[in-house]
């Protein structure tokens, strides 16, 4: 066996390093569409997962500095589109992807956008039950906003015609798929609100993929539904399909056919209701007529009882009875009064008042005489006592003193002058005499010496 040249002999480390360099230089950055599995996130914050398809798989890592830029949380089984560099982990000889960016692939991206819009509108309160408008019962005219060529319109019309053929229907044709569909749906809703032709709207389409139904996840459509004054029933896809329009609408129907069922009246049911109401009406009329007949019979009986001849006869009987009772009562009263009169007459005869009256008159005359004598004597005594009092009063009156030549002087303050201490030279005095006042000036004062009282005699000298 011939040995190779030394340069062609590789160690495992050299081999792995060479392969890594070749992969990194030749492949560079690549885009890969795959499904995520075995996703883990240890305490370091890095993401480790496997990317696979139906035939193969490869390990991948996304470091914390890069995965913080990802706007969603990767889930097991989620389809993603990643940009990565391919490398080889030299210690084990495993080759793997170092992911630099990641985004949902296909429906995954749409689902992410759906969830973001759902969270946004929910936070604004657009899904709240208080904003839901009640549907008219029954609907008088229905508007349908959908494709004029779609199966959904065909199903809706068939059910409405079968259930309630007389119900008017207005169709607002729009695209329900593609870039132009959202604005056409918005314009149709606004047009229906301006015309005010319908009292309820069905907005929807048949089934399809998430991308096919995407017009009903458009924010413009959602806000147009919320702003509508006409109640809106959403009918998008199949029962398992859920769109933003379903959350905003006043009522969600699982399918377009179900929407037609919900807002229309069943002709057979209406007939049954009509028959039931007719029976109830007939029963009510029978009951009403029977009640009125009984009332009429009672009134007739009462009228017979209140006939003028009967009333007059009853009143005559009452009058005769009352008259008899009155005569009897009067006779009884008259007899009673006659008996009382007889008894009083007897008592009066036994108690003649004339002698007593004469005695009382004499007693009265005596009392009058005695009263007059007593009054005369009392007046005489009072007059005598009054004269004595007047004489005494006259004797002590200051005016009487003045008439005897005396006078009364007052100092300037109005006090009566009693002694020389009250005045001094130059003071003015007012002096009262019998017939008036005299004003004078003090020229001089002179005090009279007090008389000395004689000493009392002793008992021995008597």
Swiss-Prot record:
Q: Which reaction does it catalyse?
A: Exonucleolytic cleavage in either 5'- to 3'- or 3'- to 5'-direction to yield nucleoside 5'-phosphates
What's a GO biological-process term for it?
Answer: DNA catabolic process
**Enzyme Commission (EC) number:** 3.1.11.6
From the Swiss-Prot or TrEMBL record, what is one GO molecular function term? nucleic acid binding
Write out the entry's keywords from A to Z. Answer: Cytoplasm, Exonuclease, Hydrolase, Nuclease
Superkingdom of origin:
Bacteria
| Disulphides | none
Chief subcellular site? cytoplasm
Q: Which Pfam families match?
A: Exonuc_VII_L, tRNA_anti_2
Q: Which GO terms describe its cellular component?
A: cytoplasm; exodeoxyribonuclease VII complex
Q: Where in the cell is it found?
A: Cytoplasm
Q: Is the keyword Hydrolase in the record?
A: yes
Q: Which family does it belong to?
A: Belongs to the XseA family.
Annotated function: Bidirectionally degrades single-stranded DNA into large acid-insoluble oligonucleotides, which are then degraded further into small acid-soluble oligonucleotides.
Q: How does it assemble?
A: Heterooligomer composed of large and small subunits.
Q: Which HAMAP family match?
A: Exonuc_7_L
| This protein's name | Exodeoxyribonuclease 7 large subunit
Upper taxonomic lineage? Bacteria, Pseudomonadati, Pseudomonadota, Gammaproteobacteria, Enterobacterales
